Amino acid sequence: APTLREWAVDEHLWIRRVAMLAQVGAGPRTDPVLLADVLVPNIPYAGEQVFFSRKAIGWALRDYARTEPDWVRAFVAAHPDLSGLSRREALKHL
């Protein structure tokens, strides 16, 4: 977890993206605190229209929504600065 938190704020997009997507597929083993910790610092990058950041945020949230839809809805509601793409992807199957 400490490594992923470091990677989430790395200067390189692809390192940040690995941190954001590291728990995709983990289902109920997903750590929601860690997920938020790696996504939140990247929301400003998503606002800068960096496609791969916006897509990764949405993908990570969409995947976790299969396990914890209420958590994902609450996360999206708490972050109105999410890009449209991230928001659409997160809520796609809800």
Where are these regions (language model features)?
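Alpha-helical scaffold domains
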Residues: A1-L94
